[in-house]
């Protein structure tokens, strides 16, 4: 049974309250580095990405440098990451598109971001919200799992349905805090196996809601 909007909001706000200082866990210094890091994080832990990116960004600090590199040169720096050959191909193509279509700058709109090779809706939403402060809600595996486990959405909900549901429940200024808190919550408490959510009864203290 999917929770009412008021009860779902209560659960999400309690998760935010558990991790009020949650921050992005990917290391980056500018919009290009953020875009690259998020692209690399697909099916890979943020910790693994953070080990690979310092040398990658030193070798290819700009879209121009990345576009000029061969795929094999890029692969050398990310070979310990999942799907690294595909990611190297996407990074080179994406860098070329940034130069050709956006004067070497990372665009700010979802439509423009999703026009880039290797950039889907989740990556676009992270870049918009974290990089540019534009309200957007990114759905990763933690977010989707938590929303289903806590009946915020039905078990069959797609990532887009999860995104729209959370955006309907929370005001825009809470979308990014919710996304980041849910990642922490998913890692520390709401595990894929043996979740420990029952130790946090405040999540379910609905009172008269």
Tell me the role of every PLM-derived stretch.
Residues 2-209:
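Catalytic cores of DNA base-excision repair glycosylases
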